[in-house]
Amino acid sequence: MFDKLEKILAYDNVFLSGGAGVGKSFLTNELIKSYRKQKKLAIALGSSALSAFNIGGVTLHSFFCLGYCDDMMKLSVLDRNQKQKEKLTKLKELLKTIELIIIDEISMVSANVFEMIGFRLKNSQFNGKILVVGDFFQLPPVIKEKKETLFNHSYYAFSSFFWQDLNFKNIKLSQPKRTQNMEFYNHLSLIRQGFLDEKILSFFESLRIDYKELENLEDDYTLLCGINKKVNNINQEKLSKLETPLVCFKAQVKKEDKRIKDEELDSWIRSLNILEELNIKIGARIIFCVNNWDKNYYNGEQGIIEDILYEEEKIYISIIKNNGMKILLEPYTFFMEELEQSGKDFVVNILASVTQFPIKLAYAITIHKSQGMSIEKLVCDIDHIFENGQLYVALSRATNPNTLKIYSTKKINFGFYFANILKIDSNVIEFYKKHNFLDLEIQEQII
Protein backbone atom coordinates (compact mmCIF):
# COMPACT_ATOMS: atom_id res chain seq x y z
CA MET A 1 0.00 0.00 0.00
CA PHE A 2 2.91 2.35 0.69
CA ASP A 3 3.87 2.20 -3.00
CA LYS A 4 0.55 3.90 -3.86
CA LEU A 5 1.23 6.55 -1.25
CA GLU A 6 4.75 6.98 -2.59
CA LYS A 7 3.44 7.64 -6.10
CA ILE A 8 1.06 10.32 -4.82
CA LEU A 9 3.88 11.96 -2.84
CA ALA A 10 5.87 12.34 -6.04
CA TYR A 11 3.44 15.10 -7.02
CA ASP A 12 1.49 16.20 -3.94
CA ASN A 13 1.75 16.98 -0.27
CA VAL A 14 -0.40 14.47 1.62
CA PHE A 15 -2.60 14.44 4.72
CA LEU A 16 -2.97 10.79 5.79
CA SER A 17 -5.90 10.28 8.16
CA GLY A 18 -8.24 7.58 9.47
CA GLY A 19 -9.62 6.36 12.78
CA ALA A 20 -7.82 4.54 15.57
CA GLY A 21 -6.23 1.19 14.75
CA VAL A 22 -6.35 1.39 10.95
CA GLY A 23 -2.57 1.20 10.44
CA LYS A 24 -1.47 4.82 9.97
CA SER A 25 1.74 4.34 11.98
CA PHE A 26 2.58 1.04 10.28
CA LEU A 27 2.14 2.57 6.81
CA THR A 28 4.24 5.58 7.79
CA ASN A 29 7.09 3.38 9.02
CA GLU A 30 6.98 1.28 5.84
CA LEU A 31 7.18 4.46 3.76
CA ILE A 32 10.21 5.67 5.73
CA LYS A 33 11.96 2.31 5.17
CA SER A 34 11.20 2.49 1.44
CA TYR A 35 12.62 6.01 1.09
CA ARG A 36 15.79 5.11 2.96
CA LYS A 37 16.25 1.93 0.95
CA GLN A 38 16.15 4.09 -2.19
CA LYS A 39 18.68 6.49 -0.63
CA LYS A 40 16.05 9.23 -0.57
CA LEU A 41 16.25 11.60 2.38
CA ALA A 42 13.08 11.44 4.48
CA ILE A 43 12.89 12.97 7.94
CA ALA A 44 10.31 11.79 10.48
CA LEU A 45 9.12 14.32 13.06
CA GLY A 46 6.86 13.81 16.05
CA SER A 47 4.68 16.30 17.89
CA SER A 48 6.16 14.94 21.14
CA ALA A 49 9.23 12.97 22.18
CA LEU A 50 7.14 9.79 22.35
CA SER A 51 5.57 10.16 18.91
CA ALA A 52 9.01 11.00 17.49
CA PHE A 53 10.42 7.85 19.06
CA ASN A 54 7.58 5.73 17.65
CA ILE A 55 8.47 6.70 14.08
CA GLY A 56 12.23 6.73 14.62
CA GLY A 57 12.58 10.49 14.31
CA VAL A 58 13.09 13.67 16.30
CA THR A 59 10.63 16.22 17.67
CA LEU A 60 9.46 18.92 15.32
CA HIS A 61 10.36 21.58 17.92
CA SER A 62 13.95 20.34 17.96
CA PHE A 63 14.26 19.95 14.19
CA PHE A 64 12.77 23.35 13.32
CA CYS A 65 14.63 25.14 16.15
CA LEU A 66 11.41 26.36 17.77
CA GLY A 67 12.63 26.19 21.37
CA TYR A 68 9.72 26.72 23.75
CA CYS A 69 8.00 29.21 21.44
CA ASP A 70 4.27 28.84 20.87
CA ASP A 71 3.71 31.84 18.59
CA MET A 72 5.49 33.90 15.94
CA MET A 73 6.20 36.82 18.28
CA LYS A 74 8.20 34.65 20.68
CA LEU A 75 9.95 32.96 17.75
CA SER A 76 11.08 36.30 16.30
CA VAL A 77 12.68 37.14 19.67
CA LEU A 78 14.41 33.74 19.86
CA ASP A 79 15.75 34.08 16.32
CA ARG A 80 17.77 37.19 17.26
CA ASN A 81 20.05 35.05 19.43
CA GLN A 82 23.47 34.40 17.86
CA LYS A 83 23.48 30.66 18.66
CA GLN A 84 19.98 30.42 17.22
CA LYS A 85 21.18 32.09 14.01
CA GLU A 86 23.89 29.44 13.69
CA LYS A 87 21.28 26.69 14.15
CA LEU A 88 19.05 28.23 11.47
CA THR A 89 21.94 28.38 8.99
CA LYS A 90 22.48 24.63 9.49
CA LEU A 91 18.73 23.99 9.19
CA LYS A 92 18.57 25.77 5.82
CA GLU A 93 21.43 23.66 4.48
CA LEU A 94 19.80 20.48 5.76
CA LEU A 95 16.42 21.29 4.21
CA LYS A 96 18.02 21.61 0.78
CA THR A 97 18.79 17.87 0.83
CA ILE A 98 15.52 16.50 2.27
CA GLU A 99 12.94 15.07 -0.12
CA LEU A 100 10.18 14.27 2.36
CA ILE A 101 9.19 15.65 5.76
CA ILE A 102 6.78 13.48 7.80
CA ILE A 103 4.93 14.97 10.76
CA ASP A 104 3.16 12.41 12.96
CA GLU A 105 0.23 12.97 15.36
CA ILE A 106 -0.77 16.14 13.54
CA SER A 107 -3.88 16.51 15.73
CA MET A 108 -1.56 17.42 18.63
CA VAL A 109 0.13 20.22 16.62
CA SER A 110 -1.46 23.63 17.13
CA ALA A 111 -2.21 26.12 14.36
CA ASN A 112 0.44 28.47 15.77
CA VAL A 113 3.13 25.78 15.76
CA PHE A 114 2.21 24.70 12.22
CA GLU A 115 2.44 28.33 11.12
CA MET A 116 5.93 28.54 12.62
CA ILE A 117 6.91 25.40 10.69
CA GLY A 118 5.66 27.11 7.53
CA PHE A 119 7.76 30.16 8.35
CA ARG A 120 10.88 27.99 8.65
CA LEU A 121 10.22 26.12 5.40
CA LYS A 122 9.44 29.25 3.38
CA ASN A 123 12.60 30.98 4.63
CA SER A 124 14.62 27.91 3.68
CA GLN A 125 13.01 27.56 0.24
CA PHE A 126 12.22 23.91 0.92
CA ASN A 127 11.38 22.08 -2.34
CA GLY A 128 10.45 18.64 -1.05
CA LYS A 129 7.09 17.17 -0.11
CA ILE A 130 5.28 17.07 3.24
CA LEU A 131 3.27 14.17 4.70
CA VAL A 132 1.22 14.89 7.82
CA VAL A 133 -0.33 11.92 9.62
CA GLY A 134 -3.06 11.77 12.22
CA ASP A 135 -6.71 12.00 13.17
CA PHE A 136 -8.22 15.31 14.26
CA PHE A 137 -11.09 13.41 15.91
CA GLN A 138 -8.60 12.19 18.52
CA LEU A 139 -6.77 14.19 21.21
CA PRO A 140 -6.34 17.90 20.38
CA PRO A 141 -3.30 20.17 20.81
CA VAL A 142 -2.34 21.00 24.38
CA ILE A 143 -2.79 24.75 24.69
CA LYS A 144 -1.30 26.06 27.93
CA GLU A 145 -2.88 29.50 27.70
CA LYS A 146 -6.10 30.20 25.80
CA LYS A 147 -4.80 33.55 24.63
CA GLU A 148 -5.66 35.73 21.64
CA THR A 149 -4.14 34.37 18.42
CA LEU A 150 -4.65 34.64 14.68
CA PHE A 151 -6.56 31.36 14.86
CA ASN A 152 -9.09 31.98 17.65
CA HIS A 153 -11.82 30.03 15.86
CA SER A 154 -9.76 26.83 16.00
CA TYR A 155 -6.47 25.67 17.53
CA TYR A 156 -5.93 22.82 15.05
CA ALA A 157 -3.16 22.80 12.43
CA PHE A 158 -5.71 22.80 9.58
CA SER A 159 -6.74 26.34 10.63
CA SER A 160 -3.32 27.79 9.86
CA PHE A 161 -2.52 29.72 6.70
CA PHE A 162 0.34 27.33 5.95
CA TRP A 163 -2.04 24.34 5.86
CA GLN A 164 -3.98 26.07 3.07
CA ASP A 165 -0.73 26.86 1.22
CA LEU A 166 0.25 23.18 1.10
CA ASN A 167 -2.87 22.17 -0.87
CA PHE A 168 -2.85 18.66 0.60
CA LYS A 169 -4.08 15.56 -1.18
CA ASN A 170 -6.32 14.05 1.52
CA ILE A 171 -6.02 10.29 1.94
CA LYS A 172 -7.54 7.95 4.49
CA LEU A 173 -7.26 4.37 5.71
CA SER A 174 -10.53 2.70 6.65
CA GLN A 175 -9.92 -1.00 7.31
CA PRO A 176 -9.46 -2.03 10.98
CA LYS A 177 -6.20 -3.66 12.05
CA ARG A 178 -6.67 -3.45 15.84
CA THR A 179 -9.96 -5.35 16.08
CA GLN A 180 -11.60 -8.06 13.99
CA ASN A 181 -15.09 -7.30 15.31
CA MET A 182 -16.73 -5.23 12.57
CA GLU A 183 -19.83 -4.31 14.60
CA PHE A 184 -17.59 -2.84 17.31
CA TYR A 185 -15.43 -1.07 14.73
CA ASN A 186 -18.45 0.42 12.95
CA HIS A 187 -19.89 1.72 16.22
CA LEU A 188 -16.52 3.27 17.08
CA SER A 189 -16.32 4.88 13.63
CA LEU A 190 -19.67 6.57 14.17
CA ILE A 191 -18.98 7.88 17.68
CA ARG A 192 -15.60 9.12 16.41
CA GLN A 193 -17.64 11.55 14.29
CA GLY A 194 -20.03 12.38 17.12
CA PHE A 195 -22.91 10.23 15.88
CA LEU A 196 -24.93 8.38 18.51
CA ASP A 197 -28.23 6.50 18.17
CA GLU A 198 -30.16 4.00 20.30
CA LYS A 199 -28.42 1.00 18.74
CA ILE A 200 -24.93 2.34 19.45
CA LEU A 201 -25.90 3.49 22.92
CA SER A 202 -27.43 0.11 23.73
CA PHE A 203 -24.23 -1.62 22.55
CA PHE A 204 -21.98 0.39 24.87
CA GLU A 205 -24.44 0.35 27.79
CA SER A 206 -24.37 -3.46 27.63
CA LEU A 207 -20.66 -3.25 28.49
CA ARG A 208 -21.27 -1.28 31.68
CA ILE A 209 -20.27 -2.78 35.04
CA ASP A 210 -20.87 -1.63 38.62
CA TYR A 211 -18.36 -1.25 41.46
CA LYS A 212 -18.82 -4.82 42.72
CA GLU A 213 -18.19 -6.24 39.24
CA LEU A 214 -15.15 -3.97 38.90
CA GLU A 215 -13.71 -5.26 42.17
CA ASN A 216 -14.28 -8.87 41.07
CA LEU A 217 -12.47 -8.48 37.74
CA GLU A 218 -9.18 -10.29 37.39
CA ASP A 219 -6.03 -8.19 37.67
CA ASP A 220 -5.23 -8.73 33.99
CA TYR A 221 -7.67 -5.94 33.12
CA THR A 222 -6.25 -2.44 32.64
CA LEU A 223 -8.31 0.51 33.82
CA LEU A 224 -8.17 3.68 31.71
CA CYS A 225 -9.20 6.94 33.32
CA GLY A 226 -8.87 10.66 32.78
CA ILE A 227 -6.86 11.78 35.83
CA ASN A 228 -3.32 10.99 36.99
CA LYS A 229 -4.11 10.92 40.70
CA LYS A 230 -6.60 8.07 40.35
CA VAL A 231 -4.19 6.08 38.17
CA ASN A 232 -1.36 6.44 40.71
CA ASN A 233 -3.61 5.48 43.63
CA ILE A 234 -4.88 2.32 41.91
CA ASN A 235 -1.41 1.19 40.86
CA GLN A 236 0.05 1.76 44.32
CA GLU A 237 -2.86 -0.02 46.00
CA LYS A 238 -2.51 -3.09 43.76
CA LEU A 239 1.26 -3.14 44.16
CA SER A 240 1.04 -2.92 47.96
CA LYS A 241 -1.05 -6.10 48.07
CA LEU A 242 1.83 -8.16 46.65
CA GLU A 243 3.97 -9.67 49.41
CA THR A 244 7.18 -9.75 47.37
CA PRO A 245 9.94 -7.14 48.00
CA LEU A 246 9.63 -3.71 46.38
CA VAL A 247 12.35 -2.91 43.82
CA CYS A 248 12.97 0.61 42.51
CA PHE A 249 14.77 1.39 39.26
CA LYS A 250 15.75 5.02 38.67
CA ALA A 251 16.12 6.26 35.11
CA GLN A 252 19.73 6.94 34.11
CA VAL A 253 19.97 10.38 32.52
CA LYS A 254 23.02 11.56 30.57
CA LYS A 255 23.46 15.05 29.19
CA GLU A 256 25.83 14.80 26.22
CA ASP A 257 25.53 18.44 25.10
CA LYS A 258 26.07 21.22 27.65
CA ARG A 259 23.87 23.58 25.60
CA ILE A 260 20.79 21.64 26.72
CA LYS A 261 19.09 23.39 29.63
CA ASP A 262 17.89 21.34 32.59
CA GLU A 263 14.27 22.42 32.12
CA GLU A 264 14.43 21.43 28.44
CA LEU A 265 15.80 18.01 29.38
CA ASP A 266 13.18 17.52 32.10
CA SER A 267 10.38 18.45 29.70
CA TRP A 268 11.67 15.94 27.14
CA ILE A 269 11.83 13.13 29.72
CA ARG A 270 8.30 13.89 30.96
CA SER A 271 6.93 13.62 27.44
CA LEU A 272 8.26 10.06 27.09
CA ASN A 273 5.95 7.29 28.23
CA ILE A 274 8.36 6.04 30.90
CA LEU A 275 8.85 6.57 34.63
CA GLU A 276 11.78 8.37 36.21
CA GLU A 277 11.26 6.04 39.18
CA LEU A 278 9.89 2.58 38.37
CA ASN A 279 8.60 0.73 41.43
CA ILE A 280 7.82 -2.95 40.80
CA LYS A 281 7.54 -6.31 42.52
CA ILE A 282 7.74 -9.90 41.35
CA GLY A 283 4.17 -10.86 40.51
CA ALA A 284 3.20 -7.35 39.37
CA ARG A 285 1.24 -6.91 36.17
CA ILE A 286 2.97 -4.58 33.71
CA ILE A 287 2.31 -2.97 30.35
CA PHE A 288 4.97 -2.29 27.70
CA CYS A 289 5.19 1.38 26.70
CA VAL A 290 7.11 1.17 23.41
CA ASN A 291 7.22 -0.95 20.28
CA ASN A 292 10.29 -3.17 20.05
CA TRP A 293 9.46 -5.87 17.52
CA ASP A 294 13.06 -7.19 17.52
CA LYS A 295 12.71 -8.02 21.22
CA ASN A 296 9.15 -9.38 20.88
CA TYR A 297 7.05 -6.75 22.64
CA TYR A 298 4.82 -3.88 21.56
CA ASN A 299 3.16 -0.78 22.99
CA GLY A 300 0.14 -1.89 25.03
CA GLU A 301 1.11 -5.56 25.38
CA GLN A 302 0.96 -6.91 28.93
CA GLY A 303 2.53 -9.52 31.15
CA ILE A 304 3.55 -10.47 34.70
CA ILE A 305 6.97 -10.02 36.29
CA GLU A 306 8.33 -13.49 36.99
CA ASP A 307 11.76 -12.56 38.31
CA ILE A 308 14.41 -9.84 38.47
CA LEU A 309 17.83 -11.11 37.46
CA TYR A 310 21.20 -9.56 38.31
CA GLU A 311 23.97 -10.88 36.07
CA GLU A 312 27.37 -9.23 36.52
CA GLU A 313 26.71 -5.56 35.64
CA LYS A 314 23.44 -6.20 33.81
CA ILE A 315 19.88 -6.34 35.11
CA TYR A 316 17.04 -8.17 33.40
CA ILE A 317 13.35 -8.38 34.22
CA SER A 318 11.90 -11.79 33.37
CA ILE A 319 8.35 -11.25 32.09
CA ILE A 320 5.74 -13.80 31.08
CA LYS A 321 3.53 -12.08 28.50
CA ASN A 322 -0.20 -12.69 28.27
CA ASN A 323 0.36 -14.94 25.25
CA GLY A 324 2.59 -17.22 27.36
CA MET A 325 5.87 -16.11 25.79
CA LYS A 326 8.68 -15.41 28.25
CA ILE A 327 11.14 -12.59 27.59
CA LEU A 328 14.13 -11.13 29.40
CA LEU A 329 13.59 -7.38 29.34
CA GLU A 330 16.61 -5.08 29.26
CA PRO A 331 16.63 -1.35 29.98
CA TYR A 332 15.81 0.76 26.92
CA THR A 333 17.67 3.93 25.96
CA PHE A 334 15.83 6.91 24.50
CA PHE A 335 17.93 9.54 22.74
CA MET A 336 17.35 13.27 22.49
CA GLU A 337 18.68 14.01 19.02
CA GLU A 338 19.26 16.75 16.50
CA LEU A 339 20.07 16.43 12.81
CA GLU A 340 22.97 18.16 11.12
CA GLN A 341 24.11 18.51 7.52
CA SER A 342 27.10 16.36 6.53
CA GLY A 343 27.92 16.68 2.85
CA LYS A 344 24.96 15.36 0.88
CA ASP A 345 23.69 13.43 3.89
CA PHE A 346 22.81 14.28 7.48
CA VAL A 347 24.15 12.99 10.76
CA VAL A 348 22.38 12.49 14.07
CA ASN A 349 23.88 14.26 17.08
CA ILE A 350 23.02 12.87 20.52
CA LEU A 351 22.14 15.71 22.91
CA ALA A 352 21.04 13.59 25.86
CA SER A 353 19.78 10.13 26.72
CA VAL A 354 17.62 8.44 29.32
CA THR A 355 17.74 4.71 30.07
CA GLN A 356 14.89 2.91 31.82
CA PHE A 357 12.87 -0.29 31.59
CA PRO A 358 10.06 0.56 29.10
CA ILE A 359 7.22 -0.71 31.30
CA LYS A 360 4.62 0.60 33.75
CA LEU A 361 2.23 -1.02 36.16
CA ALA A 362 -0.74 -2.15 34.08
CA TYR A 363 -3.54 -1.91 36.61
CA ALA A 364 -4.38 1.65 35.52
CA ILE A 365 -3.12 4.23 33.00
CA THR A 366 -4.36 7.63 31.83
CA ILE A 367 -6.23 8.02 28.57
CA HIS A 368 -3.64 10.50 27.27
CA LYS A 369 -0.79 8.03 27.86
CA SER A 370 -2.74 5.23 26.16
CA GLN A 371 -2.84 6.88 22.73
CA GLY A 372 -1.40 4.43 20.20
CA MET A 373 -1.88 1.39 22.46
CA SER A 374 -3.84 -1.78 21.71
CA ILE A 375 -5.17 -3.29 24.96
CA GLU A 376 -6.76 -6.73 25.09
CA LYS A 377 -8.58 -6.56 28.45
CA LEU A 378 -9.78 -3.05 29.16
CA VAL A 379 -11.98 -1.15 31.61
CA CYS A 380 -12.83 2.43 30.62
CA ASP A 381 -13.61 4.61 33.64
CA ILE A 382 -15.64 7.41 32.03
CA ASP A 383 -16.16 9.53 35.17
CA HIS A 384 -13.58 12.17 34.24
CA ILE A 385 -13.88 12.65 30.48
CA PHE A 386 -13.29 16.34 29.79
CA GLU A 387 -11.49 16.68 26.45
CA ASN A 388 -12.57 16.53 22.82
CA GLY A 389 -11.99 13.04 21.39
CA GLN A 390 -11.10 11.58 24.80
CA LEU A 391 -14.01 9.12 25.01
CA TYR A 392 -13.29 7.82 21.51
CA VAL A 393 -9.57 7.42 22.24
CA ALA A 394 -10.34 5.46 25.42
CA LEU A 395 -12.85 3.05 23.87
CA SER A 396 -10.81 2.52 20.70
CA ARG A 397 -7.81 1.14 22.65
CA ALA A 398 -9.80 -2.11 23.01
CA THR A 399 -9.04 -4.98 20.65
CA ASN A 400 -12.13 -7.00 21.54
CA PRO A 401 -15.55 -5.79 22.82
CA ASN A 402 -15.96 -9.08 24.68
CA THR A 403 -13.17 -8.01 27.03
CA LEU A 404 -14.11 -4.32 27.17
CA LYS A 405 -15.93 -2.97 30.23
CA ILE A 406 -17.28 0.51 30.91
CA TYR A 407 -17.38 1.84 34.46
CA SER A 408 -18.97 4.98 35.88
CA THR A 409 -20.14 6.10 39.31
CA LYS A 410 -22.54 8.67 37.85
CA LYS A 411 -26.10 8.24 39.08
CA ILE A 412 -27.71 10.00 36.11
CA ASN A 413 -29.11 8.19 33.08
CA PHE A 414 -26.27 6.38 31.25
CA GLY A 415 -27.44 7.46 27.80
CA PHE A 416 -27.65 11.11 28.81
CA TYR A 417 -24.20 11.03 30.42
CA PHE A 418 -22.57 9.10 27.54
CA ALA A 419 -23.94 11.60 25.00
CA ASN A 420 -22.76 14.49 27.18
CA ILE A 421 -19.13 13.30 27.32
CA LEU A 422 -18.99 12.45 23.61
CA LYS A 423 -17.18 15.70 22.89
CA ILE A 424 -16.28 16.48 19.28
CA ASP A 425 -14.97 19.87 18.17
CA SER A 426 -17.37 21.39 15.62
CA ASN A 427 -14.37 22.72 13.65
CA VAL A 428 -13.11 19.15 13.20
CA ILE A 429 -16.52 17.91 12.02
CA GLU A 430 -16.72 20.80 9.55
CA PHE A 431 -13.18 20.16 8.30
CA TYR A 432 -13.85 16.50 7.45
CA LYS A 433 -17.22 17.32 5.87
CA LYS A 434 -15.68 19.97 3.68
CA HIS A 435 -12.86 17.86 2.24
CA ASN A 436 -12.80 14.82 -0.02
CA PHE A 437 -10.66 11.86 1.04
CA LEU A 438 -9.26 9.19 -1.25
CA ASP A 439 -9.50 5.81 0.48
CA LEU A 440 -6.12 4.20 -0.11
CA GLU A 441 -7.51 0.72 0.54
CA ILE A 442 -10.53 0.80 -1.78
CA GLN A 443 -9.33 3.58 -4.11
CA GLU A 444 -12.64 5.36 -4.31
CA GLN A 445 -13.27 9.03 -3.82
CA ILE A 446 -15.21 9.55 -0.59
CA ILE A 447 -17.12 12.68 0.36
From Swiss-Prot:
MF terms from GO for this chain are: ATP binding; ATP hydrolysis activity; DNA binding; DNA helicase activity
Q: Does the keyword Nucleotide-binding apply?
A: yes
Q: Which GO terms describe its biological process?
A: DNA recombination; DNA repair; telomere maintenance
Catalytic activity entry: Couples ATP hydrolysis with the unwinding of duplex DNA at the replication fork by translocating in the 5'-3' direction. This creates two antiparallel DNA single strands (ssDNA). The leading ssDNA polymer is the template for DNA polymerase III holoenzyme which synthesizes a continuous strand; ATP + H2O = ADP + phosphate + H(+)
Which SMART domains has this protein been placed in? AAA (SM00382)
Entry EC no(s):
5.6.2.3
Q: Keyword DNA damage on this protein?
A: yes
Q: List the disulfide bonds.
A: none
The similarity annotation says: Belongs to the helicase family. PIF1 subfamily.
Self-association state and partner proteins as the record states: Monomer.
Mind telling me what this protein is named?
A: ATP-dependent DNA helicase Pif1
Native species: Campylobacter jejuni subsp. jejuni serotype O:2 (strain ATCC 700819 / NCTC 11168)
